[in-house]
């Protein structure tokens, strides 16, 4: 299941340093020739993939990036210092495109992989460069060139293994936000309301598992009502579905059947996907009422049904344990 997070940025390589006009002044060289050094080249802008980032959220607050300029050439034919490259960390899975031409520049998939996206300008020539038999003491040098400027579109494709589905009132986003708040090593990134909320959960082994809530699943979704078609397609690519049902609903059983009906109408194969059913919002109803609906839903599904409260952080460990159990089972085997 892939979601795309996009950010547009501007990058500019550093300007090259100017060349210098200078002459030899040693007393043993009475007719000193030119000795102006070249300017240093400007630094480049480089993207580097890292496993420590999961989203492009950093680029929401900063859009322009410039590498350092090269320094001016010096006397005695000294070349100016090269500008320092600007290395920008991006998540693995970032596809880089030229925002103007649409050309794909690169795809950063492995940690440590680098891509130069804007080269620095060349340093200018000092007057030594222009000496000739006709002009033994040129009194001019050239300026450094500007660095490359580009507008880039960054697209991040994340693979979500766990899809959280349910009607709009089921508490899907709350569940992800609570899981993230409870575990500092989980990165939570809120997309707009038109795309899923993602939360990266790290197991005790250190492996990251991407959870995504799937908005837009309402009655008529299979016909494209709301955002139905788009998100039902996303659901096809998950390994396991967590179906949340709100206990404060007038009829939790009807809510369950509505979602199942939409899944089946879109594609019968979705009904065979590993699915965990959880009654949410146990904090807003009596325990006996929650147990009543748990029994009904267990009979309906033929599977154990969990009772949780995302808001109260109740029984979430049991939910995650069940998710890990399903994910660790061989693919194609329902646990």
Curated annotation (Swiss-Prot):
One GO cellular component term: cytoplasm
Molecular-function GO terms, alphabetical: GTP binding; GTPase activity; magnesium ion binding
Highest taxon of source: Bacteria
GO process annotations (BP): ribosome biogenesis
UniProt KW keywords: Cytoplasm, GTP-binding, Hydrolase, Magnesium, Metal-binding, Nucleotide-binding
Residues that coordinate or bind Mg(2+): 173, 193
Protein's UniProt keywords contain Magnesium: yes
Residues in OBG-type G domain copies: 160-328
Family statement drawn from the similarity comment of this UniProt entry: Belongs to the TRAFAC class OBG-HflX-like GTPase superfamily. OBG GTPase family.
Function comment: An essential GTPase which binds GTP, GDP and possibly (p)ppGpp with moderate affinity, with high nucleotide exchange rates and a fairly low GTP hydrolysis rate. Plays a role in control of the cell cycle, stress response, ribosome biogenesis and in those bacteria that undergo differentiation, in morphogenesis control.
Name of the featured protein: GTPase Obg
Lineage start: Bacteria, Bacillati, Cyanobacteriota, Cyanophyceae, Gloeobacterales
